[in-house]
Amino acid sequence: MEPTSTASIKTARWFLAALLAVNLYRAMTQSVTPGEAWNYDRFIGPSCTEALSRFDVNNHMLNTLLVRISTARFHLTELSLRLPSLLAGVLYLWVVFRMARRWFGDGPAFLAVVGLLTLNPIVVDALSEARGYGMALAFWMLALELILESVQSFSLQKLNLAAICLGLSVAAALPFAAPAVALLAVFLLWSKGSGADGVPSGSVRARPPGRALALIFFLTAFVLLAIPLNHAEWKTLGVGATSLRQTINEITALSLGTSLKVIAAIARVALALMAVAGVFASVRCWRRRDGALLALTGATLALTLVLLIAAHRWLHTPFPQDGAIYLIPLTVLPVTAAILKGHNKTAQIAFLCVSAVLLARYVSQFPSGMYAAGSQFAGARTLAKTLRAKAGHASVHIGASLAAEPIINYYRARYRQGNWRPIERLPLTGVYDFYVLTPTDAALIEQRHLHVLYRDTGLTLAQ
C-alpha cells in the first residue's frame, strides 16, 4: 500500500471524519431505542448475578459487558450507553479505509467501496447504536483484514489476533457465528495451497496451525458466552426470521427504504448468483496471493449461506434479521474484487454506475436523526423530561404500554428519578398518576378522561 495521498484518498478521509462526527452527534442526542432500553433494564442496570441469571438474543454479551463498564465509569447517559458501539464504529471505519486502500488503490472504485461499506443505513445505525451488531461487524472485518495481511506476509501473531477477533465478533452478536466459522474454515482450507504461485516464500514451512486458531476462536467466544448461554432457554434464542427469503427481504427494505417485491426478488436472485459466482471465482483465484480477497470473501459468502440453511434445517435455528448485516461486506467486497480483477472496462463502468445509484439512494435516506429501530419513539427523551417536570419530587405511579415500559424504566435510571415507582410490565388495568401510551393503548385517553401532557406519532404522556 503506497503512502501517497491523492484527491480520492483525501476525500475518503474527510468523508469518514464527517461520518464519525454524525455518529457522535446521534449517540449524544437521540432518544434511547427499545432494544437499547431493554438491554439496559434487563442486563446492564441489575447486578451481575441477576443479569447473568437469564439470557435472550437481545443480550449482545460483549456489548453488554463494555456498556456496564462505560456507564459505571462515566454515569448513565445516552453517550456512555453508546460509547462502546461508537468506538467499535471508529474501528470499522478505519478497517474499511485500510482494506479499500490496500486492495482497490485509489480513484472511483476505491471511493465506491468505501461508500458502499459505510453509507448503507443499516451500517450507519450500527456504528453508534448501543447494540452488538456494529461491534461484531467491526471485529469480523478486522479479522478479515488481519488474515489478508497474513496472506501477503505470513504472521502468526496476526493470525492469532484474527482468531480472537472472530471470537469477539460472535460474543458481540450470536448471528455472526456463521460468517466467523465460515471465514476461518475457508482460510484454513486456502492455506493448504501454500507453495503455489504468488504465495510468499517461506509460507510452506509456516503454515497456520489450524487447530490452534480454531481453539483460540472457540475459547474467546466461550469465555464470554458460556455462563449466559447456560441460563438460556430455546424460546429466548429461537427468535428470528423464518426463512432466508425473509432475511434478504428485510435487509433489502432497510437498506433501500422500499418494500417493493420486485426489488426484494432482484436482491434474492443477485445474492444467489453472487454465492455461486463466488465459488467459481474462488476456485480460479484459490492459490494466488493477489486474488486472496476474492477467494476468501467469495467462498465465505457461499459457505455462510450453506451454514445458515443447514442450521435451520437440522438444528431448527432461525435465520438472522438485523444480525445479517455481515451480508453487506460479503457482497460488496467479492463483487468489486472480481470486476476490477477482470480488467473489463465495460463491467467496471457498469459497476461504478450501479454503485452511484446505490450511493445516491443511501444518501437520500441518510439516517441523521433517530435510529430506525426506535423511530416510533423518537420523542421519548422529551416525554421523559416533561414527566420529570410534572412529577417533581412526588412519589408517582406510572403506567406504560408494554412497548414503552423498558424505555421509561431506562429514563427513570437515566434521570435518577427514584420517586418514580418501577414501571411494571403489566396490562394497564390499574389506576396511575401518569400514563405513557403507544397508539395501541391510546383509547385509554378517552375512556379514562385523561389530560394529554405530551404527544407525538409514537408516544403520548397523559395524566
Which residues fall in each region the model found?
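Membrane-proximal helix-loop-helix interfaces that form the catalytic/acceptor-binding platform
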Residues: 12, 16-193, 205-351, 355-461
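Membrane-interfacial, low-structure loops and terminal tails that flank and connect transmembrane helices
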Residues: 1-5, 194-208
